Amino acid sequence: MTEPIISFKDFSFQYHSQATPTLQKINVDIYPGEKVLVVGASGSGKSTFANCINGLIPFKTKGNITGELYINNQDATVSCLHDRSNVVGTVLQDTDGQFIGLTAAEDMAFLLENNCVEQDDMKKNVSYWAEKVGMIEHLNHRPQDLSGGQKQRVSLGGILIHRTPILILDEPLANLDPATGHETLRLLNNIHEETKSTMIIVEHRLEESLDDTFDRVLLFKDGKIIANTTPSDLLKSSKLKEAGIREPLYCTALKYAEVDVESIDNLANLRDVCMSEHVKFKVKKWIDETSANNDNKYKSEPLLELNEVCVQYSDYSNSVLNNVQLNVYRREMLSIVGHNGAGKSTLAKAICGFLDITGNIQFCNRGFNQLSISERSEFVGYVMQNPNHMISEKMIYDEVALGLRARGMKESDIKIRVENVLKICGLYAFRNWPIVALSYGQKKRVTIASVLVLNPEIIILDEPTAGQDFYHYNEIMSFLIELNRQGKTIIMITHDMHLLSEYSSRTVVLSKGQVVADTTPVLVLNDKKICEIASLRQTSLFEMAEYIGISEPQKLVQLFINHDRKVRRQ
């Protein structure tokens, strides 16, 4: 009988700063060559589980351990981090924390340099893996010139060079555009088949992850494994809902169409599911009997106008933004999508005045070009993807009050505005808390509050739901919808096709610094050419429509959006 390569036996771990164990009585074996998906809500113990395997716990992060953990038949608590790194390779979720080279090539070559590999062999290895991860054209770029997704691919290439028998990827899809995420899963699958390595993928994005095949799924909740089963059996159970994880959209649509999902043999394979005549009949019947009107109306008077806006970095020959023409309308929820490096974040920074531009930007027919960053912040607020990059104060109240104090407002007036915004953001009860006591999602709301308190007309959010489990995803989006109802214009830069289709009234698609589409989300996702150009990927609802033979897939998508919104409001 094959011995497990990873074995947890009654294993518990408690951080010194925590009152209770983060992992509780974990019992699981993972065998050589297995590919395992690990899912769970924020704080469920997924990353702690992975860090116990790669050695960051206990060799870097200390805590109390009970039980046993064996890696490659060796007691994991008595080896060292260096030895563990020869067995376990890890791609971290925080790409900035893993990037150590001055260029992409230097970062990927780090291990080879330490192992004194000959330069010719080093260059061949780096070029080979850079080609595999789609970074061959960016090898000489500095880390600050790369997007979050590009940094992640560099980290992946650097780990793959090592060829460790165990590979852990912590949220590998979090910063990638949908098409690149799909290609990454295909790449990982090819690597797994070629090397027969043991692969553990920790992810929130269950639907996208299940594009790939997994031997097992481990589902975490409150530090415990509540499911250890096949993807199909997990989708049939109620465990995902119990753990606060969103099931694939097609599974929800099947239930809305009153399909008995428990009777489906391989629920994790959408193509197989849609071969059933019963499924085809039920879904088509649901479409025929239900109206799919799209009530989204976004056009009023333009609030923000961009005319022939260009941005060019000094060390790039081509413009990062190229003659962008764009109107943003009052009280709309606009999504901006595109491939990694398309210019999405650059566009936001150009609007805020962080970058020099050519062309013209107007706000309510008022020239924006001559205004300083501080003056523009009275009209436009920008919330960065990572809240830790924005927060500079120790206490919640002080962080939200920071901008008003910088404007010289009286403390009595600041108190009124800050407390009002904290109530709107659901943070009033925590107003005297330290920032470090907050979850990632709560920190995200603090950064939104720090922008909202300045009362801008437009709020730009870069990846508002990145890395969020379904509970916190809904929490953030419900909050943004409420702000929109109160009159704020919301611009969301996103890779999340669910967010795009369910929450925005209009979508602008960028590719290579240019606007290639400006229409409704459903029409964007129904256009295969646009999806290919911008590295988007149609959701499982579109795939379901095609497999079933629905001539107008957008009808199914719009029907699902309308019905799902109605269900969530109940």
UniProtKB/Swiss-Prot annotation:
It is an enzyme of class 7 (translocase). Keywords: ATP-binding, Cell membrane, Membrane, Nucleotide-binding, Repeat, Translocase, Transport. InterPro entries: AAA+_ATPase (IPR003593), ABC_Co_transporter (IPR022216), ABC_transporter-like_ATP-bd (IPR003439), ABC_transporter-like_CS (IPR017871), ABC_transpr_CbiO/EcfA_su (IPR015856), ECF_ABC_transporter_ATP-bd (IPR050095), P-loop_NTPase (IPR027417). Belongs to the ABC transporter superfamily. It is found in: Cell membrane. ATP 1 binds at residues 40-47. One of its GO terms (molecular function) is ATP hydrolysis activity. This is Putative ABC transporter ATP-binding protein SAS2569. ATP 2 binds at residues 338-345. The keyword Transmembrane does not apply. Gene3D superfamilies: P-loop containing nucleotide triphosphate hydrolases. Residues 6-247, 304-537 form the ABC transporter domain. Its EC number is 7.-.-.-. It is a peripheral membrane protein. Probably part of an ABC transporter complex. Responsible for energy coupling to the transport system. GO terms for cellular component: ATP-binding cassette (ABC) transporter complex. It comes from the Bacteria. CDD domains: ABC_cobalt_CbiO_domain1 (cd03225). The keyword Cell membrane applies. SUPFAM superfamilies: P-loop containing nucleoside triphosphate hydrolases.
